Amino acid sequence: MLNGIGFIIILVCVFGSFIMSGGKSEIIAHALPHEMMAIAGAAIGAFIVANSMATIKKAGTGIMRAFKGGKWKAQDYKDLLTLMFTVLSTFKKGGATALEPHLDQPEESNLFTPYPRLLKDHHLVEFICDYLRMMTVNFEDPHQIEAAMDADIEKHHHEEAGPQHALQIMADGLPALGIVAAVLGVIKTMGSIDQPTEILGAMIGGALVGTFLGVLLSYCVVGPLAAKLLETLEADGKPYSIVKTAIVAYAQNQ
């Protein structure tokens, strides 16, 4: 919702100021289809060349995540803290024997089932269970557990950030692609140099639409979406840090 409002403000302010200053919108409207085809087509083609199929597929999901924002709510963080307290309390009271059945089948465990939203994130649940198991067999070395968890979190973040990095590269390249489209427009104009001034002016104006579109798409569309996706990924990664902090703190205090 907030993203949509932002895009509306961009369009109203950019094109509204142009029209209010006496600009001829028909020049932009006439040049827009073929300039957009050149810029968007080149950007999408370069995106396909530069990225794996997995990253390309995740990019669409990533854009949707940028619009939706982080998936975790305040209650989810409270539930996660409660879950970690319950799990670690069970381990403290009953040891590894009491905890292992819950780790083997968390979807059937009475410790996990009260929190269905957490259970839906299979990677988070696996992360919790794997390192609790590691703690039960290597309880005397909390630093090793911490190092392993840091490496796992970093690996997960790197995998999740692939589409965001690809979108940011696309955003960085769009102004240059706008120049490419503008140069093509100038070449077309030079082929009609014998035309009247009015026609040449309209053709040059249409060519400049390419530069305009490249910069607009970069800094007002793709770039902001990439930044919002990065913010979303960082927010969605916080539960892993919470789990790591809880497990390491428990291990170090024993």
For each of these PLM feature ranges, what is it?
Residues 2, 19-161, 235-254:
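Large intracellular
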Residues 5-8, 12-27, 145-148, 152-230:
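Helix-termination/interfacial motifs at the ends of transmembrane alpha-helices
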